[in-house]
Amino acid sequence: FSFNTLNLRLGKATGDTLNSAIRAKIEELKSEDRIGTMQFFKCTLVMVEEVGGKDIPFSAITVEWLQKCEKLWSKTRSVSTIGMHMRNIRTLMNEAKRAGVIKESQYPFGKGLFEIKTSIGRKKGLTKKQLKAIFDYKSENETTNRYKDLWIFIYLCNGINPTDMLKLKFSDIVDGEICFVRQKTERTTKNRKEIRATISVQMQAVIDKWGNKPLSDNYIFPYMKGNETAIEAKAITRDVVKRINKRMKLIGEELGIGNITTYTARHSYATV
């Protein structure tokens, strides 16, 4: 993303506004199939326009203006959500500063200026005892068992992101290990790292019960076809996560554990 790209895409007549910069960023992310981030920047655009309208010059982005945003947004949004949108704004302000659109003295973020608040997140990992209760849990409802098993697979497969799980193919299995690169890091050479997860007996049981036929070109799980657009794939993933979370919430309540989500599985892998 650059302001040269912005000017070419939107034309200099639009002027240097936060709105046009966000729209350019959205187009860039869409072209890179980074749909989740694209949708988040769309939300940022809606939120800043709630406060400043459709034509917000970069010169208007002051400490006071950001404080006004924070105060308004805090009525309906969490500290962590506000923080993520503020970081989107900061990203574009950094680009504006580098491009000479704003002066250093106009930059509103930093110590003694506007500081983005961070929430103190409670730990969402489960204990070994709680995990055992989930593993041992059996329902009379087949759908509940299906999504519980997918949750277990996420946990056992190194806390795999559901996006990555649904893209796994049988060709990703090499010598008893599942090998994959996290979607969030595959575009960067610096952080790009292949993850290997040994297929345990329990993981294999989940694959055998709920997976596709074990052919090299097949996805392991029957959700993606391979011809989806990035937006369609994102929608499928969101739907599967929603279904897992719905069933795991019921299981958590029944076991007295509380709300359980796919994030709980991922965090538990990292902490247990």
Please identify what each model-predicted range represents.
Residues 111-112, 167-209:
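Conserved tyrosine-mediated DNA breakage-rejoining catalytic core shared by Y-recombinases
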Residues 23-36, 45-122, 136-137:
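N-terminal core-binding DNA-recognition domain of tyrosine recombinases/integrases
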Residues 1-46:
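N-terminal DNA-binding module of tyrosine recombinases/phage integrases
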Residues 83, 106-162, 166:
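Basic, Lys/Arg- and aromatic-enriched nucleic-acid-binding interface segment
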Residues 242-272:
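Short, basic (Lys/Arg/His-rich) helix/loop patches that form interaction surfaces
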Residues 119-120, 204-246:
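Major-groove DNA-contacting interfaces characterized by cationic-aromatic clusters
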Residues 94-104, 154-177:
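Short, charged phosphate-coordinating catalytic segments
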